[in-house]
């Protein structure tokens, strides 16, 4: 028995020496190999926290994806292998639900763990699979050259558009560039929309102005007929008389002829400017612009005269239209029916058929005080204007060649000249109006 015990002890000692010698040989061989690449040194690898138990360097700083570089050959020379000190993930801190993935020494991405497949076990060996490597192989790497930053549709700033496309490719997201430069994108300035020119005057104001101008022209025409007698030497004789047109009766056609200084039956800006007093009537220019149907900057005689035939500006005609709408084609018993002239204004004499009373009115239908009587009354057919153009009075056209004196029957007519005669007030004595006052009526 003692001999057997001695033999067993000797055999155990010999086995220990064999194992120990093999271990030393392995360490010696490993040290020699590590002279070529120190990454194969198990002792060095154990001190690096980012390497897993399989001792393969993982540049994603996460043990879950350490199989990304399973195909990396650690026996390559160091200049062709990976430099751990240049791992870009060392400077990146991802959120708890993401891990760091690098493409090269300058590109690091935080990838969601949802893109990682769960571990599958075969026996007692853990096999880890991840779709990232296959995706990254398909994605086009970005050049090292610097480029302009862009803001992605995910709200993150990328150093280049290529980096944005690479991130979209590697993560499977649909991303696009919102703007150049860092996020957030500044709102783009709205394109200047052409502002529609707003008319300075409403339609009602234009109609009222046309009505006042028509009254003014009527007063000018009336005064011209009183003080001016055409002579055989008048250069205006022999040309077309616009006043004979159906829509240019009396004062409208007469005023057109006076303004048409070159006798071309068109009023240009220089001719219309004779009545442009923008300081007092800012709606004059918009009125004539609205009457220029052909938009050629000129007014024909038809355009001129139609400009003053606004239905809404004819008081008596408007009243007749209102009565017709109320009656709906039936006769209104006991209703007052006004009498209108051809221009759409009230006639001077108005009578009520049911009561037999008559009275005098102006062209706008305003009854003259004390004129109402039973039976017929005598009213002047041409009433004074309403004074809408101001308190200065009505306007008389005079000859430029004449002196500033009272006109006689032998005076001549030439270019336009403007003077005023005072309007007699109802409450003033006739002795107070002896001399005319020169000036604009505005």
Swiss-Prot record:
Q: Where in the cell is it found?
A: Secreted, Extracellular space, Extracellular matrix
Output compositional bias ranges, type Acidic residues. Answer: 425-442
Q: Where is this region: Disordered?
A: 375-395, 420-442
The Kazal-like domain sits at: 133-185
Q: Which Pfam families match?
A: Kazal_2, SPARC_Ca_bdg, Thyroglobulin_1
User: Could you tell me the superkingdom of the organism this chain comes from?
Assistant: Eukaryota
Annotated source species: Mus musculus (Mouse)
Name of the protein in its database record: Testican-1
Q: Which GO terms describe its cellular component?
A: cytoplasm; extracellular space; neuromuscular junction; node of Ranvier; postsynaptic density; sarcoplasm
Residue pairs linked by disulfide bridges in the UniProt entry: 89-100, 94-110, 139-169, 142-162, 151-183, 316-340, 351-358, 360-379
Q: Name one GO molecular function term.
A: metalloendopeptidase inhibitor activity
Changes after translation: Contains chondroitin sulfate and heparan sulfate O-linked oligosaccharides.
Q: Where is the signal peptide?
A: 1-21
Which organs or tissues contain this protein?
Predominantly expressed in the postsynaptic area of pyramidal neurons.
Identify the keywords attached in UniProt to this record, alphabetized: Disulfide bond, Extracellular matrix, Glycoprotein, Heparan sulfate, Proteoglycan, Secreted, Signal
Give the sugar-modified residues: 386, 391
User: Could you tell me the Gene Ontology terms of the biological process aspect for this record?
Assistant: central nervous system neuron differentiation; negative regulation of cell-substrate adhesion; negative regulation of neuron projection development; neurogenesis; neuron migration
What does this protein's UniProt record list under function?
May play a role in cell-cell and cell-matrix interactions. May contribute to various neuronal mechanisms in the central nervous system.
Q: Which residues form the Thyroglobulin type-1 domain?
A: 313-379
